[in-house]
A protein has these predicted regions:
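Active-site rim beta-loop-alpha module in soluble metabolic enzymes
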Residues: 296-357
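Short, well-ordered amphipathic alpha-helical segments that serve as non-catalytic structural scaffolds
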Residues: 183-193, 326, 365-368, 413-414
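Short hydrophobic alpha-helical membrane-entry/anchor segments
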Residues: 2-11, 21-42
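ATP-binding N-lobe of GHMP and related small-molecule kinases
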Residues: 54-60, 65-68, 75-78, 86-215, ...
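A short glycine/serine-rich beta->alpha loop
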Residues: 2-4, 135-137, 170-179, 209-218, ...
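Gly/Ser-rich oxyanion-binding loop with an adjacent helix/lid
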Residues: 199-284
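Stable alpha-helical structural segments in soluble proteins, enriched in small hydrophobic residues
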Residues: 22-26, 185, 192, 222, ...
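Glycine-rich, charge-dense phosphate/pyrophosphate-binding loop(s)
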Residues: 11, 50-52, 60, 65, ...
Length: 457
C-alpha cells in the first residue's frame, strides 16, 4: 500500500471514529431532551425537532446543498433542489427527523422548494470584492487530515477586475507569497469561474495578511477559500444560492483534505471526511472560554517536508491508538470536559515523527505548556507552530486577574522552552472563532442588484 493510500485509510478511520463520537453525544443529548426519544412528541402544540435543537448540529439549513453535480449547475432548471441527504434524493422536509410546527409544514416545504429555483437573471457581475478569512489549526493531535479549528486571526483579500494581472501583499509573509498564478488565491478564483462556466477575466489581487505564512495555521486553505468566494461574487453568483457546501466541495477538492478548508468556511471546530462520493463535515461544539495560545517560530515549515518524514505504513496498534484518541477528543469538546483534552490530543501517527526529525522543541514545549496549566497542547497542522488550549478560572479573560490567567502562565512557559532550544518566534493568544469566511465589501454593492424572487408565504 502506498504512503498516500495508507494516509487516506488512516484519515478515514480516524474521521469515522470522530464522527461516531459526535453522533453518540448527539444521541445522549436528544434522549435528555425528549425523555422517551419520541420524534413525534409535541410541546405547546408544536412537534419537536430534536436534531436541530442540539447546538452541536445546528447549521444554516438553507445553505446546505448536498447533491452533486446539480449543486454546481449554473442553470437553475438543472438543479435538483435536494438538500441534506447526499445521494438519496430526499429533501430535509421529507425526512422523519425534520418536524416543523404542525400548522406550517406546507409553507416550510414551499420555502425550501423555491429556495433553490431562484432565477439568477439580472444579477450584476461585480467589479471588486473584499473577503475576510480566518486562520485554522488542523489535525489537533490524532485527527490527521480530518479535524480542524477556526482561529480568531484573519486575513483580508481584495480581488478586482483590471487591465493587467497583479498580486500585491502586505503583512505576515508578504515577501514569501507567490506573485504568479501558482498563488492559491488565484487557483481558487480560477476554480470558481470554471464552476460557474465563465472565463476567468484579468484580475488584480491584494492581500492584507495577518495569518503567518507556512507556519501550520492554514494560510494556503484561507487563500483557496478567499479565492473561491471572490471568484463566485465576481462571476455574478449570489452565495446563498450556491450554498456553503458548494464551497466545501471545490475547496477540499483543491486542498485534498477538509481539515483546514472546512473551518475556514464554517468556523468553529469541524470534522471532515470523504464518504466515497463527496466531502462531508460536521461541527463539534466548542467549549466556552477556550483560549488558544500559540508559539509561532520564525522559520517556514513546508507541508511537503512534514509529510515526507512520515512512514509509508503504520502498525495496527498505532492506528487503534489514534482512533481511540480521536473519539475521546471529540467527546471532550462536545461535553466541555476539558480535563480529557490532554489525553484526547495524544498521537502516534505524525507528531512523534515530526518532533524527532523536524521540531526538536515540540514535545518539551507540549510538556511545559501542560505543566503550566494548559488543557492540552499539540502541533498545529504540519508545524512548526505549537498550539496550547487553555481555560481561565472564570472562562472570561476580562474578568480575571493576571494570576488567574492560565493563558499567560502557559505563554510564559512556552516562551521559556523556545529560549532553551534557541528557537526564535512569537507568542499569540486568541480564541476559537465560530464564524468562517465572509464578504465584507462589494463594488457595486449587493443591494444594487434587482430582486429576483419575492413571496409572502
Amino acid at each position: 500500500m502506498s504512503q498516500q493510500d495508507n494516509g487516506k485509510l488512516i484519515a478515514t478511520a480516524v474521521g469515522a471514529a470522530a464522527a461516531g463520537a459526535t453522533l453518540a453525544v448527539m444521541a445522549m443529548k436528544m434522549m435528555d431532551k425528549q425523555g422517551n426519544n419520541n420524534n413525534n412528541a409535541t410541546t405547546n402544540g408544536y412537534r419537536r425537532y430534536p436534531y436541530y435543537d442540539d447546538p452541536i448540529h445546528r447549521r444554516d439549513l438553507p445553505n446546505v446543498i448536498m447533491n452533486d453535480p446539480s449543486m454546481l449547475m449554473t442553470d437553475p432548471s438543472e438543479r435538483s433542489g435536494s438538500i441534506g441527504h447526499g445521494q438519496t434524493g430526499m429533501t430535509r422536509s421529507d425526512s422523519d427527523n425534520l418536524l416543523f410546527p404542525h400548522n406550517h409544514e406546507e409553507k416550510m416545504r414551499r420555502r425550501i422548494a423555491t429556495r433553490y429555483t431562484i432565477e439568477e437573471e439580472n444579477i450584476l457581475p461585480r467589479d471588486s470584492v473584499t473577503v475576510r478569512v480566518p486562520a485554522t489549526s488542523a489535525n489537533v493531535g490524532p485527527g490527521y487530515d480530518c479535524i480542524g479549528i477556526a482561529v480568531d486571526l484573519w486575513s483580508e483579500v481584495t480581488v478586482s477586475r483590471a487591465e493587467t494581472f497583479e498580486i500585491t501583499a502586505e503583512g505576515e509573509g508578504a515577501e514569501s507569497m507567490p506573485k504568479d498564478d501558482s498563488n492559491y488565491l488565484v487557483v481558487g478564483c480560477k476554480a470558481a469561474f470554471e464552476a460557474a462556466g465563465k472565463p476567468l477575466p484579468t484580475l488584480k489581487y491584494h492581500v492584507v495578511s495577518r495569518i503567518p505564512y507556512a507556519r501550520g495555521l492554514g494560510s494556503s486553505s484561507a487563500a483557496i477559500v478567499a479565492g473561491i468566494v471572490a471568484g463566485l461574487v465576481l462571476a455574478g453568483h449570489r452565495l446563498p444560492c450556491w450554498g456553503s457546501e458548494a464551497l466545501l466541495q471545490i475547496a477540499a477538492g483543491i486542498e485534498g483534505h477538509p481539515d483546514n478548508v472546512a473551518p475556514v468556511i464554517y468556523g468553529g471546530i469541524q470534522l471532515g471526511i470523504h464518504n466515497g462520493t463527496r466531502w462531508v463535515t460536521e461541527r463539534v461544539q466548542s467549549p466556552p472560554g477556550l483560549q488558544m495560545v500559540m508559539f509561532i517560530p520564525d522559520f517556514v515549515g513546508k507541508t511537503s517536508d512534514a509529510r515526507g518524514v512520515l512512514p509509508p505504513t503504520v502498525t495496527r496498534a498505532d492506528a487503534a491508538f489514534n482512533i481511540g484518541r480521536a473519539a475521546f477528543l471529540v467527546h471532550a469538546f462536545a461535553t466541555n470536559n476539558l480535563d480529557n483534552l490532554r489525553w484526547g490530543v495524544q498521537d502516534k501517527l505524525h507528531q512523534p515523527q515530526r518532533g524527532d526529525k523536524l521540531y526538536k522543541y515540540l514535545y518539551p514545549m507540549i510538556e511545559a505548556a501542560e505543566n503550566a496549566g494548559a488543557c492540552c497542547a499539540y502541533l498545529s497542522g504540519a508545524g512548526p507552530t505549537v498550539m496550547a488550549l487553555t481555560s481561565g478560572a472564570s472562562g472570561d479573560i476580562f474578568a480575571q486577574r493576571e494570576k488567574e490567567r492560565t493563558d499567560i502562565l502557559v505563554a510564559k512557559a512556552m516562551i521559556q522552552c523556545a529560549k532553551d532550544f534557541g528557537v526564535d518566534g512569537k507568542l499569540l493568544v486568541t480564541n476559537v472563532v465560530s464564524e468562517g469566511a465572509r464578504v465584507v465589501k462589494v463594488v457595486p454593492p449587493f443591494s444594487t442588484g434587482e430582486i429576483t424572487y419575492r413571496d409572502n408565504i
